[in-house]
A protein has these predicted regions:
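Hydrolase catalytic cores
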Residues: 229, 252-256, 281, 339, ...
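C-terminal subdomain of the subtilisin-like protease fold in secreted/lumenal serine endopeptidases
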Residues: 157, 280-284, 417-491, 496-502, ...
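Edge beta-strands of extracellular beta-sandwich domains
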Residues: 509, 544-554
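Subtilisin-like serine protease catalytic core
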Residues: 166-209, 214-264, 278-281, 294, ...
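Primarily auto-inhibitory N-terminal propeptides
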Residues: 20-80, 95, 102-106, 114-129
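Substrate-binding/access-modulating region of protease and related hydrolase catalytic domains
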Residues: 235, 251-345, 371-374, 391-405
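Catalytic-core environment of secreted peptidases
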Residues: 192-203, 354-402
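Autoinhibitory propeptides
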Residues: 73-159, 166-169
């Protein structure tokens, strides 16, 4: 069923490592080779896509963008003939090495001037034969989009409608042109099942990488990512349609399904930097870390400060580089440990809690706040009895913030398409302010169920506001009237123009506003029997500034 990607290129690099006492280690270096690179010549160390994103958003290029020093890496490999470089992180100035040396940490610490920190992050229980045939590929064909604005979501109708993202779809924002990367534990059979067939045919699966076992295809095993991806990308009209079916996708395996070690956080960091190199707009993952197979490692509540976990640190750096990062809040809400995990507690990450399709909090959805008192979760979407696509080609129900997070990420992708010039922080801020509990956040769902039509309107608002507006709802249901309040500091004359798009006839009305709050009511025509819904464009002018809003009517 999968369309072959004939333009993909494959990298084949095979090394054979016969392990005696193998382990993997994270080393954070104490300095970078500042003579090797120059901020004035970013082409030497940043991809064209990364440079373009920085130019677009006015993001400065800094020494943080410089690669890890090759000289330092060579020193490590020269100290230990069994040492093999696995991955690097330029943002955190560190690297992961494989070694068979029986006392690798002591060996490296003897050269302490080179490093700030070293720890063992993975232990192999038995000697292993590593055959690293890299299955990384990229699709060079031009992506196409053949998806209408008016969608039949099938079983997934309510899980889409509860966040009002269907209104963004109706406005034409389904994620087209937005690149979204998923970091997960494998996407078994995703290249074969019906839910994603359209994406392969339209060349919107742009790249795939397995960081954990580079020799294995991400489609080979590990079914968690398959269900996660379907929440965003499923396109089976009448059966299941995801929250952003028109996105371009990168699929990256960071999770080792065999074990739970700290190295998975480092894999996650590598995946973020990979996304940066590709110019990715949004990264989502349904992963979290508090406990590990090595019980000497433990993320206690005091670790939920955004400054402890390497993954959490990297998440905030990614946002500073122009990306938006979304993560599941976690599924510990009904357990002794009921808090969110890392990296969901990162300052600028959007941590997503779970609800059912009528708005009840899922009992398993993890609680905030962070250790330093910040509100979490940042929003909520359906993750309880969620309809998802599975590796056996069936559409079934599943539970977990693993599903609410990608559902949410797809909705954010629709906003990103609608506002390509807004910064990541501006979009994150609008999303948080659009939560039902924003005025009175709690520890259960944080800012609450997010209204993405409200977020859209918040991003429409001008910065130079003489007037402030309060809409109880941006969707008019069962009545023919628009109602909202306008607050002004002084008496002001305004003109309001509004229209139903299907009718195309503009109505106008003048108001003399008094200082303080003013109630506004505008009549709108009934929908014809042929129309299930319509969009209302609202333009308010005070003679100095125009204020634009978009409402839905059904």
């Amino acid at each position: 069923m999968k369309k072959p990607i004939t333009t993909a290129f494959f990298l084949f690099l095979t090394t054979f490592l016969f392990s005696q006492s193998p382990a993997k280690y994270w080393i954070q270096f104490s300095f970078k080779d500042l003579d090797a690179y120059s901020i004035d010549n970013p082409e030497a160390f940043l991809s064209p896509a990364a440079i373009e994103k920085r130019k677009h958003f006015g993001i400065p290029i800094t020494e943080q963008d410089f690669p890890v020093s090759t000289k330092l890496i060579e020193i490590i490999t020269n100290l230990d003939s069994t040492a093999v470089l696995l991955t690097t992180s330029k943002w955190l100035n560190g690297a992961t090495f494989y070694s068979e040396h029986p006392d690798f940490i002591t060996l490296i610490k003897k050269n302490g001037a080179l490093i700030n920190y070293i720890e063992q992050t993975y232990t192999c229980s038995d000697p292993e034969l590593f055959t690293q045939t890299n299955t990384l590929f990229f699709n060079a064909e031009t992506p196409q989009v053949n998806i209408p604005n008016d969608l039949d979501y099938g079983f997934g109708t309510q899980q889409i409608r509860i966040n009002n993202v269907h209104w963004l779809h109706r406005l034409g924002y389904k994620g087209e042109g937005v690149s979204l990367q998923l970091n997960d534990g494998g996407f078994q059979n995703a290249d074969q099942i019906r839910h994603f067939q359209q994406h392969f045919e339209d060349n919107r699966v742009r790249g795939v990488r397995n960081i954990v076992q580079p020799e294995k295809s991400t489609f080979q095993d590990g079914n968690h990512g398959t269900g996660v991806w379907s929440c965003i990308a499923a396109y089976l009209p009448g059966e299941l349609v995801g929250s952003a079916p028109a996105c371009n996708f990168y699929l990256v395996q960071t999770e080792d399904n065999r074990t739970e070690y700290v190295i998975e956080e480092d894999n996650w960091v590598v995946a973020l930097e990979f996304a940066d190199s590709l110019g990715v707009d949004i990264v989502t993952s349904s992963l979290g870390y508090t406990t590990f197979d090595d019980t000497t490692y433990y993320r206690g509540y005091n670790s939920l400060d955004g400054k402890t976990s390497r993954a959490s640190l990297a998440a905030d750096i990614a946002v500073s580089k122009g990306m938006i990062v979304v993560n599941s809040a976690g599924n510990s809400g009904n357990k002794k440990w009921h808090y969110i995990g890392c990296p969901a507690e990162a300052t600028h990450i959007l941590a997503v809690g779970a609800i059912d399709s009528i708005g009840n909090k899922a009992p398993f959805s993890s609680f905030g706040p962070t250790y330093d008192g910040r509100v979490k979760p940042d929003g909520a979407a359906v993750g309880w009895q969620t309809y998802v696509g599975r590796e056996n080609d069936k559409t079934v129900r599943g539970n977990g913030t693993s599903y609410s997070a990608p559902m949410f990420a797809g909705m954010v992708a629709c906003l990103r398409q609608a506002f390509p010039n807004k910064t990541s922080i501006e979009i994150i801020d609008a999303v948080r302010k659009s939560g039902a509990n924003y005025a009175v956040p709690d520890s259960a769902l944080g800012y609450g169920i997010t209204d993405f039509l409200k977020a859209y309107n918040l991003l429409l608002e001008t910065d130079n506001k003489n007037l402030s507006f309060n809409f109880n709802t941006f969707v008019i249901t069962g009545k023919n009237e628009i109602s909202f309040t306008v607050k002004t500091k002084e008496d002001t004359e305004v003109t309001i123009h509004y229209l139903l798009r299907e009718d195309g006839e503009v109505a106008s009305k003048d108001f003399n506003l008094k200082a303080g709050e003013n109630e506004i009511s505008l009549p709108v025509a009934e929908l014809s029997e042929k129309r299930k819904y319509d969009v209302i464009d609202l333009k308010i002018s005070d003679g100095k500034t125009e204020y634009l809003y978009v409402l839905g009517k059904e």
